[in-house]
Amino acid sequence: MPAAVSISQEILKPHLEIQGGHTLSRELKVSGAKNSALVLMTSALLSEGPLELHNVPQLTDIQGMADILASLGVRVKRSQETVWLQADGLHHAEPPYDLVNGLRASFFCIGPLLGRLGHAKVPLPGGCRIGARPVVEHIRGLKALGAMVKVEHGVVTASVPGTSRRLKGAAIVLDCPSVGATETILMAAVLAEGTSTIENAAQEPEVQDLAKMLNAMGARVSGAGGPIITIEGVERLHGCNYSVIPDRIEAGTFLIAAAITRSIVRVSPVIPEHLNAVLQKLRDCGCTLEIDKQGITLIPGDLHGVDIITQPFPGFPTDLQAPFMALLTTAKGTSVVTEKIYENRMQHVAELQRMGASIRLQGNTAVVEGIPQLSAAPVSGNDLRAAAALVLAGLAAHGISQVDGLNHLDRGYDEIETKLNASGAHILRHQPSG
């Protein structure tokens, strides 16, 4: 009789094999914020001095950004959670397409390059395909600062006219509180001549983190975290040592992992104020939260459905919409999840349905009817947060699930299976050769 072929051998793609039904315990460690670290790294372009970043997550996106900066002439060194950068030999203002194609954050280079060199040529970025996510607001802000910008054949070319090659301060009102546009304009404006204001600015913690580090480099930024940011331009910045804030999305993912497995788990380090909307929804679901200065302990209860509407910070974050939906699939009653930020961020619904979830999709709204337990299935994460949601679903499902899409997952989670396994999960990573 031929040997039985395991389910995992049938999947040729790299994937996680998750044995569901195990409770978690102990503490889950949160890495530095990916969305903050990426933009902080590009800030190295603004100064000749050395920038030393600590608490940097070890992710494929971080390496991608390091490669992009190196291609521009930045010296880059990495050692575990520390990244050292120095742009004293900055000689190039056009990152190559093959490096920027898979990383949306690559577009953050345009603001610092304009501010420092007076010109930049940056291909339109890649990343998760969860919607248009245009750069119109970024470009409009750069034009307001005096840059000449054109978009041609998928490449954005920008330059500062005149002999000074220096941007001019301006009052900018964003049509929507875009995080990327706010950060791009902020980095461009710190070396501009005069004062700039950004109204309807994004208030996300990552914007606050950027402003704090820029100030440590000698910038004069005030109001970050509110709707109006003021930037008094300076002639030059210097290097600094800086520690990236904890990743609020990873922290939220781990809290949801505790809830979906009905486990008591402590998650740290966390800045609770960065997760207020998520913490409230967990309480509304029936969870108890014990919060201190260093972390949050989740104690599950009899979970029931809640309604979720994604909003810009301080509202419920779009990056936790998919993971929270996974939780709601096994919560009693009906939940309604509405995605207001991106128009194509429901790709996880079909995969959750493969695991037995009862979900009706109506445009960007999902109606979830809770069931007692999900069933294991082979599923595919088509974007970063969808992949995370499926990992959580696998933890709670009966049987052994296989989750592929690790190229997405590894962009945003630092050794997620290692951390979950240390807390009691049973996850194997399969990386087929050839």
From Swiss-Prot:
Q: What is its main location?
A: cytoplasm
- Metabolic or biological pathway, per its Swiss-Prot or TrEMBL entry: Cell wall biogenesis; peptidoglycan biosynthesis
Per its UniProt record, what Gene3D superfamilies does this chain match?
A: Enolpyruvate transferase domain (3.65.10.10)
Asked if the Swiss-Prot or TrEMBL record annotates the protein with the keyword Nucleus, the reply is: no
Q: Where in the cell is it found?
A: Cytoplasm
- Keyword Translocase recorded: no
Residues that bind UDP-N-acetyl-alpha-D-glucosamine: 104, 319, 341
Q: Which reaction does it catalyse?
A: phosphoenolpyruvate + UDP-N-acetyl-alpha-D-glucosamine = UDP-N-acetyl-3-O-(1-carboxyvinyl)-alpha-D-glucosamine + phosphate
- Which residues of this UniProt protein bind phosphoenolpyruvate? 34-35
Which protein family is named in the record? Answer: Belongs to the EPSP synthase family. MurA subfamily.
Official protein name in the record: UDP-N-acetylglucosamine 1-carboxyvinyltransferase
Write down the species.
Answer: Prochlorococcus marinus (strain MIT 9313)
